[in-house]
């Protein structure tokens, strides 16, 4: 079973993403901060991560670095309002597998998630 980890501090968006990406063969785990995300990653089994950059307890880019150092096989899609070319290039150069700016289309998000899985 695929396991998606959503790390997004906006509760409404987090819940909406969870609902939109849920499938029979997919488990959704959601966190709203880095601390909870790190605890969840220690449990293992994550197939893909949707990661916001601006979180209440730090930068998602710092967590991205840790993920790519410790579990490089897990695809990470950055999901953020930071939408300048410089932000996008920075996120991809730091190891993100994809970069989606808010606001976004759910159909595009689903397609990008499915491509990474």
What are these regions (language model features)?
Residues 61-72:
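Short amphipathic alpha-helix used as the core "switch/output" element in two-component signaling
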Residues 56, 84:
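The feature encodes the CheY-like receiver
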Residues 30-48:
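Acidic, metal-coordinating helix/loop segments flanking the phosphotransfer/catalytic sites
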Residues 33, 59-62:
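Acidic catalytic/metal-coordinating carboxylates
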Residues 8, 55:
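Conserved acidic carboxylate
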Residues 52, 80:
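Active-site residues of response regulator receiver
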Residues 10-29:
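Two-component/phosphorelay signaling modules centered on CheY-like receiver
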